[in-house]
Amino acid sequence: MANLRDIRKKIGSVKNTQKITHAMKLVSTSKLRKAEEVARNSRAYALKLDAVFDDVLSKMKNQGIEDIQSKYFRELERLEIKKVDIIFITADKGLCGGFNTNTIKKVLACTNEYKEKDIKVRLRGIGKKGNEYFSFNGIEVLDKINNLSSMPNYERAQEFMKKVVEDYLSGKTDKVIIIHNGFKNMISQEIRVKTILPIGYKIIHQNPQPNETQETITSEPSGSEDEILDSLAEKYVEYSLYYALIDSLAAEHSARMQAMDTATNNAKDLVKTLTISYNKARQEAITTELVEINAGVEALK
């Protein structure tokens, strides 16, 4: 009977877990819808920012201004890279499947790839899970910040990028990339790697949906060409990180929703299996008791 009690306890425990995972799935689904809407609106802004870059550069080209002196811009094919900063974004919480693991694996792969080319790599981390992993494994992370990937904030992202931009402009790094797990759709995510500094001409023109941003600049901005580009570049870099944070959060909710759905289904299957085991054990116990009763009756005859 002790075995039956143990199985009953397990069934009760699994059912409680099932209720929790189902509730977490519903919460993640609700949060995902909101995050998806924010990501969609933010993407529209990012596309318009790209369109502004395109328009400014095309106007400069039409005016015969080919030599851009701004340090934010480089022809990537001619650029010699010796130092790279990798900004990675992970979640502050777990229970989201391979969301964090996949990002960390990509960071490690990129780091090894650069090191094989004798390129120095520095890491800058956003998100508790990633920062904890690298700290535990003795891998240095230059800048760490938590509670930003779970609550994207433009001012905090802007503050984080100030040091990054300062290091780039002062020559402490030649290239800055962002690695994060991005939202693809309700049931899938994808690892995204984006170079944000320097801003190469190909990066500016990489947008595959030009029809979404056909508006052009109609007024002539004041200031030199490089001042205009520097001002736009600062916004571009800051918003690139902010959009990556929003995109990552939507992907995180998507991954957690899937993970909790899988956990709920697994709990259902486990309850069925345990129930079958319980019924078998109960039947065996009843059979054993009947045999013992019959044996006792026979002994009294």
From Swiss-Prot:
Membrane topology per record: Peripheral membrane protein
CDD domains assigned: F1-ATPase_gamma
Superkingdom as given in the UniProt entry: Bacteria
Residues in the signal sequence: none
Keyword terms, alphabetized: ATP synthesis, Cell inner membrane, Cell membrane, CF(1), Hydrogen ion transport, Ion transport, Membrane, Transport
GO CC field: plasma membrane; proton-transporting ATP synthase complex
Pfam families to which the protein is assigned, alphabetical: ATP-synt
Subcellular location: Cell inner membrane
Main location: membrane
SUPFAM superfamilies documented for this protein: ATP synthase (F1-ATPase), gamma subunit
GO biological process assignments: proton motive force-driven plasma membrane ATP synthesis
GO molecular function: ATP binding; proton-transporting ATP synthase activity, rotational mechanism
Tagged with keyword Cell inner membrane: yes
Subunit-level organization: F-type ATPases have 2 components, CF(1) - the catalytic core - and CF(0) - the membrane proton channel. CF(1) has five subunits: alpha(3), beta(3), gamma(1), delta(1), epsilon(1). CF(0) has three main subunits: a, b and c.
Function: Produces ATP from ADP in the presence of a proton gradient across the membrane. The gamma chain is believed to be important in regulating ATPase activity and the flow of protons through the CF(0) complex.
Family stated for the protein in its record: Belongs to the ATPase gamma chain family.
Protein name as annotated: ATP synthase gamma chain
Source organism (scientific name): Helicobacter pylori (strain Shi470)
Taxon lineage: Bacteria, Pseudomonadati, Campylobacterota, Epsilonproteobacteria, Campylobacterales
Gene assigned in the entry: atpG
